Amino acid sequence: MTNIRKTHPLLKIVNSSFVDLPAPSSLSSWWNFGSLLGICLGVQILTGVFLAMHYTSDTAKAFNSVTHICRDVNYGWLLRYLHANGASMFFICLYLHVGRGLYYGSYTYTETWNIGILLLFAVMATAFMGYVLPWGQMSFWGATDITNLLSAIPYIGTDLVQWIWGGFSVDKATLTRFFAFHFLLPFIVAALVMVHLLFLHETGSNNPTGIPSDPDMIPFHPYYTIKDILGFLIMLTALSTLVLFSPDLLGDPDNYIPANPLITPPHIKPEWYFLFAYAILRSIPNKLGGVLALVMSILILAIVPILHTSKQRSMMFRPLSQCLFWLLVAVLFTLTWIGGQPVEHPYIIIGQTASVLYFLIILIFMPLTSIMENYLLKW
């Protein structure tokens, strides 16, 4: 009799995705981050649902409801800090996952790549709205600052901002709708993940060499299930250590001050995972130009497949491109650091230089280097 996992209508979908899925035999640990992101999403949805049971999306009660969760709810402090630091782990895995895709040329699977970019935008929107919910100083002023950027859109900008706010400033209506969307978006993300996997399983996984691996495939289970479990254990250990030993390491102390529209914090900044984009935004003196640069800093990923000029898919055997890739990583770290600094000399010029370099490396240097490598290899 045929095994039930191969005949049952529901189980055979799971079987073809996680058990009998043919996978390249050469996948390195850089291929672990997809499954780690799945775990992160699961942790965020679970902790988020339990937090939502005790949270109140009202400007007068939001801050106190978070305090109540931490002090009075059984293990509420654990839920709150798992959720807050889980977001940081989510973005660490996301950026490493995207970096892996860039390094090994996974972006040539354009459908999977484009759904991935949509996922990145959706997760960023979710995280931004989640940061507003505790209604501390940085929550309120971050929401005011970032939503106000939309006023740079010609003609409809001001009306659009007031429509998003639900009034003439960030207030009760804004908090309520942000809570509603923050609850809804992770489920949309989960649906997009299914589409992402659907497109990935149409083509099969890429591998470190970038060479088609059809003649040398192995079943996903037990080889990669065991490998993924090791990844889960390492990540959950790191997350637990962060939550239990220094839960506020990645947060902002200003968010422990209740939101006050009359007092502006000395330095408004988003969470660390948005600092690189925030630095690019601040590098341009013009408001509309800054907003466009901010959007393009992520949207530029969509044109990476068009800019691929190399005859090889992966960077594994392309040392010149590797140097540029790691320069890009260094530029991103620099931008993240600058985003957290005040707007003064020398930070302004460093931020502007790093922003220009970021776009130059992706748009000009990488395609030209690939052409040069082709020439050197007489291709």
Curated annotation (Swiss-Prot):
Transmembrane segments: 33-53, 77-98, 113-133, 178-198, 226-246, 288-308, 320-340, 347-367
GO molecular function: metal ion binding; ubiquinol-cytochrome-c reductase activity
Amino-acid positions noted as binding heme b b562 in the UniProt annotation, renumbered to this chain: H83, H182
Co-factor binding details: Binds 2 heme b groups non-covalently.
CDD domains: cytochrome_b_C, Cytochrome_b_N
Cofactor entry: heme b
InterPro entries (alphabetical): Cyt_b/b6_C (IPR005798), Cyt_b/b6_C_sf (IPR036150), Cyt_b/b6_N (IPR005797), Cytb/b6-like_sf (IPR027387), Cytochrome_b (IPR030689), Cytochrome_b_C_euk/bac (IPR048260), Cytochrome_b_N_euk/bac (IPR048259), Di-haem_cyt_TM (IPR016174)
Record membrane topology: Multi-pass membrane protein
Localization annotation: Mitochondrion inner membrane
Alphabetical UniProt keywords: Electron transport, Heme, Iron, Membrane, Metal-binding, Mitochondrion, Mitochondrion inner membrane, Respiratory chain, Transmembrane, Transmembrane helix, Transport, Ubiquinone
Residues annotated as binding heme b b566: H97, H196
Signal peptide as annotated in the record: none
Broad class of the protein's primary localization: mitochondrion
Example GO BP: mitochondrial electron transport, ubiquinol to cytochrome c
Residues annotated as binding a ubiquinone: H201
Matches recorded under Pfam families: Cytochrom_B_C (PF00032), Cytochrome_B (PF00033)
GO cellular component: mitochondrial inner membrane; respiratory chain complex III
Alphabetized SUPFAM superfamilies for the sequence: a domain/subunit of cytochrome bc1 complex (Ubiquinol-cytochrome c reductase), Transmembrane di-heme cytochromes
Function of the protein: Component of the ubiquinol-cytochrome c reductase complex (complex III or cytochrome b-c1 complex) that is part of the mitochondrial respiratory chain. The b-c1 complex mediates electron transfer from ubiquinol to cytochrome c. Contributes to the generation of a proton gradient across the mitochondrial membrane that is then used for ATP synthesis.
Miscellaneous comment as given in the Swiss-Prot or TrEMBL entry: Heme 1 (or BL or b562) is low-potential and absorbs at about 562 nm, and heme 2 (or BH or b566) is high-potential and absorbs at about 566 nm.
Assembly: The cytochrome bc1 complex contains 11 subunits: 3 respiratory subunits (MT-CYB, CYC1 and UQCRFS1), 2 core proteins (UQCRC1 and UQCRC2) and 6 low-molecular weight proteins (UQCRH/QCR6, UQCRB/QCR7, UQCRQ/QCR8, UQCR10/QCR9, UQCR11/QCR10 and a cleavage product of UQCRFS1). This cytochrome bc1 complex then forms a dimer.
PANTHER family named in the record: CYTOCHROME B
Family assignment from sequence similarity: Belongs to the cytochrome b family.
Protein name per its UniProtKB record: Cytochrome b
Gene designation: MT-CYB
